[in-house]
Design a protein with these regions (language model features):
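Juxtamembrane intracellular "pre-TM" segments in multi-pass secondary transporters
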Residues: 1-2, 192-225, 407
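Cytoplasmic helix-loop-helix junction between adjacent transmembrane helices
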Residues: 112-150
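Transmembrane alpha-helices of Major Facilitator/SLC transporters
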Residues: 257-279
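A late C-terminal transmembrane helix in Major Facilitator Superfamily
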Residues: 338-367
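Helix-to-loop junctions at the C-terminal end of transmembrane segments
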Residues: 65-78, 271-283, 366
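Short amphipathic helix-loop junctions that connect adjacent transmembrane helices
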Residues: 26-49, 240-256
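C-terminal ends and interior cores of transmembrane alpha-helices
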Residues: 88-103, 293-304
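Hydrophobic core of transmembrane alpha-helices in multi-pass small-molecule transporters
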Residues: 93, 106-121, 308-322
Length: 407
């Protein structure tokens, strides 16, 4: 029963973190496209498109910083207290966001969205919690279900916003705030109390000295970062630019793109719920296979017609979900000595960095042709899969030599 509550709490946190990030997507465009200028959409007389871009960017920026810091902080202060506090804090952040919309305060809205994103970077803590408390096949399945919850949030967020907007623009944020408060109660009930840490370092020292990127001082984790960054650059190129490909190839509108997104999120969610079982193949070998599948889907999208492209978009979700399940489970086993919070934080931070890199590079490449960024993304994913296979062979040889020396 405890495991059920534990996994449910982690999945609810994951679901609500991505719901929180995706809630504004259908809400903000009408606010900034309004014909009548107001204090919100023309703050300081700045162009509304500039304000809109900042409003969309600020929450993922908070997620990036939170992903790097919250995992290591949970290694120091414990998963339970940090998850409870970040859930309550994110709920308050959603409430302040709603209030900012009511009073049309753009600065308050930006601050609230940043802080909410920072606190919703607790996905690394949720992963570390499962890695700590569960073992073997159950751990892999729980990690897979957690990923499914993350994917589902990107689908549910815009749907929730669209379904409740009729009652007011602030209603979706109040619903998210209430749900997060319930999750905090679930965490309090489902997680056992942890023994107080004997360390005396302050939170600032932990944040400064033990953030996830400090793990790059270790050779194996440096290699992990490189292959993961290459693969997630491919994934980010797909996520960020397949909607533009649909617009340019078949003149899809927002509603048509949303239906394609439903298919993608559905394939990722279903695969995540079914994945995580035992396998006789080495984790890195399987990760390489799934990386090849990701590269193939992106490449087919770049080169195919509209129907082939839509099939590639939906099917992309299968290898992507399988890859994340395998690599997270393997990292939890291989690098547990470095702290599960820091390790899971490194994976989350890497994906955030990839999104920023691809957004900047892609904005230049699409000036020539949108397919270029997709081709580059496919090549990045293919290189990562190839490099992963070589790394697997190297680690196997090194582990065998270490066992022989120990004997």
């Amino acid at each position: 029963m405890k495991n059920i509550i534990l996994i449910t709490a982690a999945c609810m946190l994951a679901l609500l973190s991505t719901i929180g990030a995706s809630l504004p997507y259908p809400i903000l465009p009408p606010l900034f496209a309004a014909d009548a200028p107001n204090a919100f959409n023309h703050f300081l007389g700045l162009p509304s498109k500039l304000l809109f871009g900042l409003a969309l960017t600020i929450n993922p920026l908070g997620l990036l910083i939170g992903s790097a810091l919250l995992g290591p902080l949970s290694d120091r202060y414990g998963r339970r207290p940090l998850l409870m506090r970040t859930a309550v804090g994110a709920a308050i952040g959603h409430a302040i966001t709603a209030w900012a919309l009511v009073i049309q305060s753009y600065p308050l809205f930006i601050v609230a969205r940043f802080i909410t994103g920072l606190l919703e970077g607790n996905g690394a803590v949720a992963r570390a919690m499962l890695a700590d408390q569960l073992q073997g096949p159950l751990r892999l399945r729980a990690m897979s279900w957690l990923n499914g919850a993350f994917y589902l949030g990107w689908l549910v967020g815009p749907i929730l916003a669209g379904a409740t907007l009729a009652w007011g623009v602030t209603v979706p944020f109040w619903i998210a705030a209430g749900a997060l408060m319930l999750v905090a109660v679930l965490v309090a009930a489902g997680l056992p109390r942890e023994a107080p840490s004997l360390l005396t370092s302050s939170w600032w020292q932990v944040a400064r000295d033990r953030h996830s990127l400090n793990l790059l001082r270790h050779e194996e984790l440096r290699t992990l970062f490189i292959v993961q960054l290459a693969l997630t650059c491919g994934v980010a190129s797909f996520y960020e630019f397949y909607p533009l490909w649909l617009v340019e190839t078949a003149h899809y509108n927002a509603q048509a793109i949303a239906w394609v997104n439903v298919g993608l999120c559905g394939s990722m969610t279903i695969t995540s719920l079914l994945a995580g079982g035992p396998s006789r193949h080495a984790p890195l070998l399987r990760a390489g296979w799934y990386g090849c599948g990701i590269a193939l889907a992106i490449g087919v999208l770049a080169m195919g017609n509209i129907w082939v492209g839509i099939a590639a978009i939906v099917l992309f979700g299968i290898p992507n979900a399988l890859y994340n399940t395998v690599i997270q489970g393997w990292c939890a086993e291989r690098f547990s000595a470095h702290g599960q919070g820091a390790v899971m934080g490194l994976l989350s931070t890497t994906f955030c960095i990839a999104n920023i890199v691809v957004a900047l590079g892609g904005s230049l490449l699409i000036l020539i042709d949108t397919r270029l960024i997709l081709v580059v993304g496919a090549l990045c994913a293919a290189w990562s899969a190839w490099r992963m296979d070589g790394w697997r062979r190297h680690l196997h040889a090194a582990d065998a030599a270490a066992l022989k020396a120990a004997a």
